């Protein structure tokens, strides 16, 4: 039995080696002039991942019927969104010339929170398929991703998807592509990624219209580090675009950013999973296993070079690491699980380098972490992965944005925890200004909902920048400048609500601007509950403060003494609720006529309750915080 199993393993390993060898031979036979690196530009849910599956089927990378092959995370498949950019190599034989082409597809996220993933992916591409849903037309993220691709000089091929739907308006979609992006209608390829209709027309178009990489294999190695992930067996795996030169197993390499030296233990292509090859050469997108132990050593946008050749190698421009813009406090639902949860969060952060992690302690909730994310969806996805992959339960505080504090002596400070927000006395003395991040939001919506959407933006302290009526489509595109704090407070949900789900949203940062902001605190018997503090615009504090005290009152149990719940902003109490004390019947054993004894006992009880209120420590259980923080 053992020998049979061993034989089966040996036979499988031999087949893998033979398969990898034939793959390498096929790659070696294709010159760089027949490489095509491309991506797919689209709005969320316009069919990127489905189209990727059809292309992989057509090139025999996967068997027909595979679903969302490049969406490898469970949460990606469940939500139907792409979170991590993935790459896959394909071989395509052009039926017109019988020549083999090596295609590298990078499937990118569509949601604005993962824009950094998109820009990194475009850096290794020569062109892109611009995907538009025939039933919805051009949407906000289509526009934003188009301009990003255009600014990076990508050759764009317009593709109209979902033409099989009854509500598809192909003519309108083509008009929008021509009017908004100045791409001729005649260039549009009309497909149905779901059924596979006309998808085969895309491969010749990719070969004909997208230029090959321009690198030279004889030059010194220059590899652009596009992404990284952590593997428990291999350590950090690097996704790289080989701009010039070539790299093979056993090569010594050095990083330009921090001068760290490594030996390449394995290199290869994604097909769609890792397949080891002898060499990666100029123009290819593949992976390297350098024996790197920590993800923080992999600086995205870094240049990898051959050791000893760094003096004659020009470093690539690279790109800026994204900065977290949404912060939440995270605490274990059970304080005893802190150590296990700390390990789980650390492991997950290894694979999501854009999350910032810092330990913090709350008087109310104990030990926890301050987590920084790219946006609200990013935060939601991270916590969902933590629950599903590790079974961890968290209490999350309300999301907040980073605030910039400028002092009169020229010092600047970024505040990510509302509890650190300066109090009124400091503000009067040493403070020059309080600033918050703003974004420019792009919204596309049907004209009939314009009034309600404008009202929502105005209520969110927005400033209108531009309004464009899209020709003959009944659609409007709005540009508004908004505080990011309103955007993370479920602005997208409110936008969907007032537009009945028809509006789409995209945004980009425009920097910090001065605002009239204050800290709103919840006090219980005069003590601030630090985990519940929030920074907001002054005109929000009164109605939110009243909501807070009413809501929190529901979750506090009656005590033997009076409990006072207050909301305080700018050192001023703006709302109050009182939970009356439980009353013990101290008169039950008295005779009805003993009036003096009756008065004495009631006076003693009153004084006792007063003393208890002064020194009493109210125990607020974790369920109360969870219920209060739940929307």
Swiss-Prot record:
Topology of the protein relative to the lipid bilayer: Peripheral membrane protein
Start and end residues of each tr-type G domain: 33-214
Cross-referenced Pfam families: EFG_C, GTP_EFTU, LepA_C
Cross-referenced InterPro entries: EF-4 (IPR006297), EFG_III/V (IPR035647), EFG_V-like (IPR000640), G_TR_CS (IPR031157), LepA_C_sf (IPR038363), LepA_CTD (IPR013842), LepA_IV (IPR035654), P-loop_NTPase (IPR027417)
The UniProt record lists the keyword Transit peptide: yes
One Gene Ontology term of the molecular function aspect: mitochondrial ribosome binding
Enzyme Commission designation: 3.6.5.-
Compartment annotation: Mitochondrion inner membrane
Cysteines engaged in disulfide bonds, as pairs: none
Annotated transit peptide: 1-19
Keyword Hydrolase: yes
Keywords: GTP-binding, Hydrolase, Membrane, Mitochondrion, Mitochondrion inner membrane, Nucleotide-binding, Protein biosynthesis, Transit peptide
UniProt-listed SUPFAM superfamilies: EF-G C-terminal domain-like, P-loop containing nucleoside triphosphate hydrolases, Translation proteins
A GO biological-process term: positive regulation of translation
Chain positions recorded as GTP binding sites: 42-49, 107-111, 161-164
Catalysis: reaction(s): GTP + H2O = GDP + phosphate + H(+)
Cross-referenced CDD domains: EF4_II, EF4_III, LepA, lepA_C
GO annotation, cellular component aspect: mitochondrial inner membrane; mitochondrial matrix
Gene3D superfamilies: 3.30.70.240, Elongation factor 4, C-terminal domain (3.30.70.2570), Elongation Factor G (Translational Gtpase), domain 3 (3.30.70.870), P-loop containing nucleotide triphosphate hydrolases (3.40.50.300), Translation factors (2.40.30.10)
Homology family: Belongs to the TRAFAC class translation factor GTPase superfamily. Classic translation factor GTPase family. LepA subfamily.
Protein's job: Promotes mitochondrial protein synthesis. May act as a fidelity factor of the translation reaction, by catalyzing a one-codon backward translocation of tRNAs on improperly translocated ribosomes. Binds to mitochondrial ribosomes in a GTP-dependent manner.
Protein name: Translation factor GUF1, mitochondrial
Biological source species: Kluyveromyces lactis (strain ATCC 8585 / CBS 2359 / DSM 70799 / NBRC 1267 / NRRL Y-1140 / WM37) (Yeast)
Primary gene name: GUF1
């Amino acid at each position: 039995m053992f020998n049979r199993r061993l034989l089966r393993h040996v036979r499988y390993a031999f087949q893998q080696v033979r398969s990898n060898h034939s793959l390498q031979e096929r790659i070696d036979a294709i010159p760089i002039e027949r490489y095509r690196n491309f991506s797919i530009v689209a709005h969320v849910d316009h069919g990127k991942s489905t189209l990727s599956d059809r292309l992989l089927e057509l090139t025999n990378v996967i068997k027909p019927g595979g679903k969302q092959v490049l969406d490898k995370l469970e949460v990606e498949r469940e939500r139907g969104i792409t979170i991590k950019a993935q790459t896959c190599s394909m071989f395509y034989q052009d039926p017109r010339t019988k020549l083999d082409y090596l295609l590298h597809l990078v499937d990118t996220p569509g949601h604005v929170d993962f824009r950094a993933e998109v820009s990194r992916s475009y850096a290794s591409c020569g062109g892109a398929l611009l995907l538009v849903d025939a039933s919805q037309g051009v949407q906000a993220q289509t526009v934003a991703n188009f301009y990003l691709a255009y600014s990076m000089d990508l050759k764009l091929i317009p593709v109209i998807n979902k033409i099989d739907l009854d509500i598809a308006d192909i003519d309108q979609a083509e008009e929008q592509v021509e009017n908004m992006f100045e791409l001729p209608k005649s260039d549009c390829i009309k497909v149905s990624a779901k059924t596979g209709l006309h998808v085969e027309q895309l491969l010749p178009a990719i070969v004909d219209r997208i230029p090959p990489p321009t690198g030279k294999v004889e030059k010194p190695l220059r590899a652009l580090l596009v992404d990284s992930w952590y593997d428990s067996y291999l350590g950090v795996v690097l996704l790289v675009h080989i701009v010039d030169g070539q790299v093979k197993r056993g090569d010594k390499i050095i990083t330009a950013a921090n001068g760290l030296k490594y030996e390449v233990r394995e290199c290869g292509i994604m097909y769609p999973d890792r397949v080891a090859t002898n060499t990666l050469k100029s123009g290819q997108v593949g992976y390297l296993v350098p024996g790197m132990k920590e993800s923080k050593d992999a600086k995205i946008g870094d240049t990898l070079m051959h050791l000893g050749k760094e003096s004659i190698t020009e470093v690539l421009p690279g790109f800026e690491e994204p900065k977290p813009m949404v912060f939440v406090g995270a605490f274990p639902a059970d304080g005893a699980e802190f150590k296990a949860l700390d390990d789980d969060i650390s492991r997950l952060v290894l694979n999501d380098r854009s999350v910032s992690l810092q330990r913090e302690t709350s008087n109310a909730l104990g030990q926890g972490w301050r987590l920084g994310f790219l946006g609200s969806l990013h935060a939601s996805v991270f916590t969902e992965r933590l629950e599903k992959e590790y079974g961890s339960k968290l209490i999350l505080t309300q999301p907040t944005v980073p605030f910039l504090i400028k002092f009169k002596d020229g010092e600047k400070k970024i505040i990510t925890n509302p509890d650190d927000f300066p109090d009124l006395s400091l503000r009067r003395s040493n403070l020059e200004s309080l600033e918050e991040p703003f974004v420019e939001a792009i919204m596309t919506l049907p004209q009939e909902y314009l009034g309600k959407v404008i009202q929502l933006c105005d209520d969110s302290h927005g400033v209108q920048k531009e309004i464009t009526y899209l020709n003959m489509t009944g659609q409007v595109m709005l540009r508004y400048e908004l505080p990011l704090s309103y955007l993370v407070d479920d602005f997208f949900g409110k936008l969907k609500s007032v537009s009945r789900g028809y509006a789409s949203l995209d945004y980009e940062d425009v920097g910090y601007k001065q605002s009239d902001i204050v800290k709103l605190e919840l006090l219980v018997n005069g003590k601030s509950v630090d985990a519940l503090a929030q920074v907001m615009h002054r005109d929000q504090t009164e109605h939110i403060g009243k909501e807070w005290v009413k809501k929190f009152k529901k979750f506090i149990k009656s005590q033997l003494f009076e409990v006072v719940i207050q909301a305080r902003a700018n050192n001023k109490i703006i709302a109050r609720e009182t939970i009356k004390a439980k009353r013990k019947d101290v008169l039950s054993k008295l005779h009805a006529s003993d009036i003096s004894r009756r008065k004495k006992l009631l006076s003693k009880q009153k004084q006792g309750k007063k003393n208890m209120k002064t020194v009493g420590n109210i125990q607020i259980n974790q369920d109360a915080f969870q219920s209060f923080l739940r929307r």
